[in-house]
Amino acid sequence: VEDTLRIRRFVEDQKPKTAVLAGGGFIGLEMAENLAEMGVSVTIVQRPKQLLAPLDADMASFVHAEMRRHGVALRLGETVTGFRQDGDSVLTLLEESEPLHSDMVLLAIGVTPDTHLAKDAGLRLGIRGSIAVNERMETSVPDIYAVGDAVEVTHFVTGQKALISLAGPTNKQGRIAADNICGGNSRFHGSQGSSVLKLFGLTAASTGINEKA
């Protein structure tokens, strides 16, 4: 929320005309939509050759068309290597082509669990440094619970441990943990990662796994 307010204040005060956005996931696309509707010319740089990785490529093509139809430029399959100040603008350095000039740059390149506190406390960690919990959302240390983007969960479709950084599962985990802390016996059995995004005039949704998985 603080980042959102800071970005909005910057746009209102500095009135940037151009923006480069690194990352083409849900947050990145929502940010691109909002900036475009505020009159900012947006370019999205994305290392994979499609936006919204959970979608299959043929479905993502509809998202690409909608973004371009609203003036958002796409640089797919390109890698950001760094940034450099150039007077009043910022240069976004690309591995495959010439730098991009813009008035502002935003990073929306995913979520990594920040679990230093859990590690220091001796809690067992899971995939990619996430916090391992049981179905009661209890960690490896009795009476210590964890929920949200930093915990690993079971993916319904694959049966494997996964990181699913979505508000819906987090909300459910929080209620289950609270119930157990208060003496209940609720269980979180996993998630299949259902998500939906409204983007300009298009609605894109996904659930489960895609062809790449």
Which ranges hold each PLM region?
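A Rossmann-like FAD-binding core segment of flavoenzymes
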Residues: 37-135
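Active-site-proximal substrate-binding core of FAD-dependent oxidoreductases
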Residues: 160-165, 169, 179-211
